[in-house]
Amino acid sequence: MRSWPSPAVPTLSGPSVPLRLYDTSDQAVRSVNPGAVSGMYVCGITPYDATHLGHAATYLTFDLINRVLRANGHEVHYVQNVTDVDDPLFERAARDGIDWRDLGARETDLFCEDMQALRVLAPQDYIGAVESIDEVIALVGRLLENGAAYIVDDPEFPDVYYRTDATEQFGYESGYDRATMERFFAERGGDPDRPGKRDPLDALLWRAARPGEPSWPSPQGPGRPGWHIECAAIAQNRLGVGFDIQGGGSDLIFPHHEFSAAHVEADTGERRFARHYVHAAMIGLDGEKMSKSRGNLVFVSTLRRAGVDPAAIRLGLFEGHYRTDRAWSDEVLARAQARLDLWRNAFAAASSPDGAELVGRLRRYLADDLDTPKALSALDAWAHRAVTSGGPDPDGPSTVATAVDALLGVAVSA
């Protein structure tokens, strides 16, 4: 699947600062310490609607990680999926009287346009679930063979499920207790009451074909993948086991990331699917959670059509820390645009305070669990001084502009 063109990223001079990130599984900030090539998998969209600001905040978080790692001299093997086989896509397509494949392609194209406008670095591998069906079938077969999966006793719909007790470490990624797991499983696409399951938490691996649903042939009979096994297969086949970062929104901690990890761990015998589990918080609107059910989603494409500078969207979402639930509002956007105008005026100044010193601080702040509030505050103070009184560094404006482009993904000019 084709993604989108990546913007050019300037090369930064000066010493690198090792990246430290909060690991959900350890509930602590830990050093990432990748090798020459850092592997990162981020769960992608289900393409039944346009990209909203909650999506954007997640992908901008991992774009920052990508940029910090690259600035530190690492190559990044970035993999992202598209969940183009899923119930919400089928339901929306049926509601709108459109083929689910056409809807998925249309919304994936719009997502790519939004990511390009936001200057998000594209993944090296951008893989749809439809493209990975054979990989899923192979993984399901291995899990059945080693006893980590079973077929429910249902002659009409013999679905395949993963045994939650297949590995002794199940639950380490989220750290949730049983009651919390059961609640989130029911709320987030699980089927705890499905007759024939051995445990209410057992996760669907292969859904036997139902009338009116797309299906693919397999040794287990015609059907389609479950949600979690798609990401497990895609990541395993491109990054292996023990890659650096598994990422997504905080709503994916459980069940999605817990089970994706468990599927691969049960297949390979390894104890840790990824070395770090990193999650971005949720975005609300005017103090309320942003959600489909509330009808208060703010779409990136809508803001773009209204003439909003995508760089202002980036800065508005960077105003708060990535792990803090936060609200979007007209005031947030206005502050972001004012900040962007100030910075661009400073980049055009004849001189400024010491640019290299500021860049060093920016690298330290972003390497410290992506502390964008500190980074933005430091840039504001520098820019205000550059605009009002200049400074002793004639190269400062260009030095800082290059760093802002490389690290924050904000272009010097509109």
Swiss-Prot record:
Amino-acid positions noted as binding L-cysteinyl-5'-AMP in the UniProt annotation, renumbered to this chain: C43, G44, I45, T46, T58, N81, V82, T83, W227, G249, S250, D251, I283
Any GO molecular function: cysteine-glucosaminylinositol ligase activity
Example GO BP: mycothiol biosynthetic process
Keyword annotations: ATP-binding, Ligase, Metal-binding, Nucleotide-binding, Zinc
Disulfide bonds: none
Pfam families assigned: tRNA-synt_1e
Primary role: Catalyzes the ATP-dependent condensation of GlcN-Ins and L-cysteine to form L-Cys-GlcN-Ins.
Similarity annotation: Belongs to the class-I aminoacyl-tRNA synthetase family. MshC subfamily.
HAMAP family to which the protein is assigned, alphabetical: MshC
UniProt name for this protein: L-cysteine:1D-myo-inositol 2-amino-2-deoxy-alpha-D-glucopyranoside ligase
Species this protein is from: Tsukamurella paurometabola (strain ATCC 8368 / DSM 20162 / CCUG 35730 / CIP 100753 / JCM 10117 / KCTC 9821 / NBRC 16120 / NCIMB 702349 / NCTC 13040)
Gene behind this protein: mshC
